[in-house]
A protein has these predicted regions:
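Well-ordered alpha-helical segments embedded in enzymatic catalytic cores
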Residues: 51, 55, 169-172, 229, ...
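Acidic/His- and Gly-rich active-site-bordering loop/insert found
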Residues: 74-97
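Short glycine- and acidic-rich boundary segments immediately preceding or forming the N-terminal edge
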Residues: 21-78
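Short beta-strand/turn micro-motifs at beta-sheet edges
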Residues: 76, 145, 257-260
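C-terminal accessory segments enriched in acidic
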Residues: 19-46, 180, 209-219, 223-493
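Surface-exposed patches in mature extracellular/periplasmic domains of secreted proteins
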Residues: 67-71, 120-125, 244-250
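Active-site/substrate-binding loop(s) of hydrolase catalytic cores
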Residues: 88-90, 97, 102-243, 262
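Bacterial Sec-dependent N-terminal signal peptides
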Residues: 1-23
Length: 493
């Protein structure tokens, strides 16, 4: 009897947990199950048309998917549209209009997997497919993606070609929009990582906009609907990346596709993926795109967005441009000409492409000096109380890379040597961002000045505890093993 009661209790408890899980908001359930939908063949931002095309070909034979070749880019790369569903409401999404803005393209591949697989979301999928017809144009600018650049092969910003339509990629988008007379449009982009969400220390990791359709920035019914749906997105994002949502300036741009598609009668939403801490390949933001797009499809299919007050959209802070740095060193005692100046140093890191734009390494430089109390950074260091000196160059010229193995990098750094002159020439991506600066025989020490990448020593009680090398700050006590491993892997030290 006791066994029967126990089993009955377990069944009821399990059913209760299942019901509780199914009653959780859609975005929470999607987040918990995201890894099963994430397309494993794409893990970094610099994928090409040749990487994406097999995934589009793969869904051609899948039930419920329709694939149509829309045309070709200037250099002859195919541009396709993938359609899902048969509902009366048409939704058009286009990504990578700018070739170096790939985050949403990754998310679209994940969305394809969501609809392809049998999973716990069959009811949601069925409703979306019954009420909506989704049309995806992934990688509208494949020639730009090949070079990992914003513009197309003609050097044109496609988002300024909505009126003249001089480029085939722009013509394709306009023709599709007109032929569908789409009810909704999602304009999917990336933005720079130095935007903040308002005057705050938080990155604008996702920025949104219901673009204006005229210079007066009037709000008609369609634009209001777009604002309401953005309110739904905002609530989802606040649950996952709180305070990291920004709003784009809504000044009317007469040449832009988003503004014009809004004007042509499609409820248009701009989504921009910015920066997020410790997410250089934007995999967190890829997931956020996945969540807010599927939540949007669900909301449109139910009509629930109509209950969202406009004040939610209006409460989203505007982007603060140029507000962030990668690293800010605060209250640095900068020595110069026998005097000491207390200054903040704002350092940014820039990607330098190589291997046909499929890889990159980082170069850093000081981008601002002075009182940076109104700026913020992904990483900050309070240098107050530290004595600051310029890093020294190791006095001996090393002829061959293999000779570096005889040097102890930690001992060098503790003695103030941040640079080694090497006669043998190494590829720049090998030496970039290392805890030691590897330079040529005749290189000069970089000063603390705008546009330069100085090496600095931070001392307390005569002991060097931190070093700044190649734009990165290193703690010699806590990160000794990381430093050793990095130099061993790259240089054999």
């Amino acid at each position: 009897m006791r066994t029967t009661i126990t089993l009955s209790f377990l069944c009821i408890f399990s059913f209760s947990l299942m019901a509780q899980d199914m009653s959780a908001p859609l975005h929470e359930r999607l987040s918990e199950n995201y890894e099963q939908f994430k397309e494993s063949s794409i893990r970094h931002r610099r994928f090409k048309h040749q990487d994406l095309q097999p995934l589009i070909e793969q869904v051609k034979g899948e039930e419920g998917f329709r694939v149509k070749k829309l045309g070709e880019s200037i250099e002859g790369r195919s541009i396709s549209m993938v359609s899902i569903g048969s509902g009366e409401t048409s939704v058009l999404l286009w990504s990578q209009m700018h070739g170096n803005e790939p985050t949403a393209s990754m998310a679209i591949m994940d969305i394809f997997n969501f609809f392809r697989q049998e999973n716990d979301f069959e009811e949601v999928k069925a409703r979306i497919k019954q009420e909506l017809t989704l049309h995806f144009i992934p990688m509208l600018n494949p020639d730009g993606a090949e070079r990992f650049q914003r513009r197309n092969a003609n050097g044109v910003d496609l988002n300024r070609d909505a009126l003249r339509l001089q480029n085939p990629e722009a013509q394709i988008l306009k023709d599709v929009r007109d032929s569908l007379d789409a009810d909704w449009g999602f304009n999917l982009h990336d933005q720079g990582k130095y935007y903040a969400a308002g005057p705050s220390p938080y990155t604008a990791s996702i920025s949104v906009l219901a673009p204006a359709f005229n210079y007066n920035k009037d709000i008609n019914g369609n634009r209001a609907n777009a604002m309401q749906l953005i309110g739904i997105m905002h609530e989802v994002l606040q649950a996952h990346i709180p305070n990291r949502i920004g709003r784009y300036n809504d000044d009317f741009e007469p040449r832009a596709f988003g503004d014009n598609i809004q004007k042509w009668g499609t409820r248009t939403i701009l989504i921009e993926s910015g920066g997020y801490p410790n997410d250089p390949e934007k995999q967190v933001l890829r997931k956020m795109n996945f969540l807010i797009l599927l939540e949007s499809f669900s909301s449109i299919s139910e009509g629930s967005y109509r209950d969202m007050p406009l004040r939610v959209y209006e409460s989203i802070p505007f982007n603060s441009y140029n507000h962030l740095h990668d690293l800010i060193l605060r209250k640095v005692a900068v020595p110069k000409d026998g005097k000491t100046y207390t200054l903040d140093l704002g350092i940014r890191r820039f990607e330098v492409d190589y291997d046909r734009n499929s890889k990159y390494f980082l170069r850093s430089s000081i981008q601002d000096i002075g009182d940076l109390s109104t700026s913020h950074a992904y990483e900050e260091f309070n240098a107050e109380g530290y004595e600051v000196e310029m890093g020294k160059s190791y006095p001996k010229l090393i002829k061959k890379q293999k000779k570096l193995s005889k040097l102890d990098p930690i001992e060098l750094l503790k003695e103030g040597y941040t640079s080694i002159k090497l006669k043998e020439s190494l590829d720049p991506w090998i030496t970039a961002a290392l805890p030691l600066h590897i330079s040529g025989p005749f290189s000069q020490r970089a000063p603390i000045a705008l546009g330069y990448e100085p090496s600095l020593l931070f001392k307390k009680g005569g002991k060097i505890t931190y070093v700044l090398v190649n734009g990165f700050l290193w703690n010699l006590e806590k990160e000794e093993q990381i430093i050793r491993d990095m130099l061993q892997e790259r240089l054999g030290m």
